[in-house]
Structures are given as structure tokens and as C-alpha cells.
Design a protein with these regions (language model features):
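Short, well-structured alpha-helical segments
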Residues: 39, 43-46, 63, 103-114
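His-Asp-centered metal-binding catalytic motifs of divalent-metal-dependent phosphohydrolases/nucleases
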Residues: 59-78, 82-86, 110-117, 134
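Short helix/loop segments within enzyme catalytic domains
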Residues: 19, 97-101
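Divalent metal-dependent phosphate-bond-processing catalytic cores, especially two-metal-ion Mg2+/Mn2+ enzymes
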Residues: 4-7, 11-18, 28-57, 68, ...
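Short amphipathic alpha-helical interaction patches enriched in hydrophobic/aromatic residues
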Residues: 27-31, 70-76, 94-98, 117
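An active-site-proximal "capping" alpha-helix that borders the catalytic cofactor pocket
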Residues: 45-50, 81-96
Length: 178
């Protein structure tokens, strides 16, 4: 007899990569702003975040942030409200795409998205790692990350030591430019 899982249980297959990939696909659907804030940026933010993650960081929230923080952008340059729009749109996904998150994880994700363009740091290790994961990818638009503006110790280290950042990510400075 076949048994089908319904509700939150269907997401408890420990296949986080599959769930993250569904979010990535959702974010890419209809994306029209090109690569500056598109999939390649999101993938680097995810990679950067995992590099920055300490034991205190919720890596699931960090990975989801990578693919959702820019989803509701309306342009690539003058859109300081996109984080707020992301936080306002995420509740619509709570019962579907993000139904497997705990309330704490969902709230962390909303806060990280909302504040990532307007806040330097929060003191929360997960949210601050999200901020720095995004900031370390400023290189793609010719902006060198400022160690003084990073929210985490690791983020500040990598911003001050870009050679080590490139070595640890297996990249070079030329891999980032658009």
C-alpha cells in the first residue's frame, strides 16, 4: 500500500537542497532585471553565506535569503525599498513554498530581507551573516567591500583580506565583474 505524505510532513525528507532549489526556481521565474541581481548573484550570496556561517547561524535561513532578498526588485540601482517589499511578499509563500520553515526561521528570513539594505547589523548571527553574504558580492559592480561596514567578524576578515576570500571560494576577482 502506498502512503502519501501531506502537509508539513511531506517536507521532512531532509532534502534541503531540493527545497532550496524550488525557492531558487520560484525566484528565477519571470526575472527580468538581468544578472546584476539575478541567479548568478544569488548563487554567490548563498556560497558566501555558507562560508561565513558559524555554528550560531541558521544556514537554511541564510540560503533562502540568498534567493529571496532581491526577488521583488523593480530596478538594479535605485530601489532601496526592495528589502521591505520582499518582507511584505514573503507571508504569501508561508502556506506553500515556505510552509516547512519554523516560525522562528520564517521571522528571521523576513527580518533579514527587510533590513538588508537599510541596516548595518542587528546582533543576530543569522541575519548579520545574510547581510555580509550579500555585501561580499558588491565586487561584481566594482565596489570593494568595506571591513568597517561588515556585520560579522568573518565578513570583516574577508573584506579586509580579499585574496583569502578568493582562495577560500575558489574564485578570482575577475570572476565577479558583470
Amino acid at each position: 500500500m502506498l502512503q502519501f505524505l501531506v502537509g508539513p510532513e511531506m517536507f521532512m525528507d531532509n532534502n534541503i537542497d531540493s527545497l532550496i532549489n524550488k525557492v531558487k526556481q520560484f525566484s528565477a521565474e519571470g526575472w527580468s532585471l538581468g544578472v546584476c541581481h539575478g541567479v548568478s548573484h544569488w548563487e554567490r550570496v548563498e556560497r558566501n553565506g555558507l562560508l561565513l556561517a558559524t555554528d550560531e547561524v541558521n544556514s537554511i535561513v541564510l540560503r533562502l535569503f540568498a534567493y529571496l532578498h532581491d526577488k521583488w526588485r523593480v530596478d538594479n540601482w535605485e530601489d532601496l525599498e526592495h528589502g521591505k517589499r520582499a518582507a511584505e511578499n514573503l507571508p504569501a509563500l508561508r502556506g506553500t513554498l515556505l510552509s516547512w520553515l519554523t516560525d522562528e526561521e520564517f521571522n528571521l528570513l523576513c527580518t533579514a530581507c527587510e533590513l538588508h539594505t537599510v541596516c548595518h547589523s542587528t546582533g543576530n548571527p543569522t541575519i548579520d551573516a545574510c547581510f555580509d553574504a550579500d555585501r561580499l558580492d558588491l565586487i561584481r559592480v566594482g565596489i570593494t567591500p568595506d571591513p568597517e561596514r561588515m556585520a560579522t567578524e568573518r565578513g570583516a576578515f574577508y573584506a579586509a583580506n580579499l585574496g583569502q576570500f578568493y582562495a577560500d571560494t575558489g574564485t578570482s576577482e575577475y570572476d565577479f565583474y558583470l
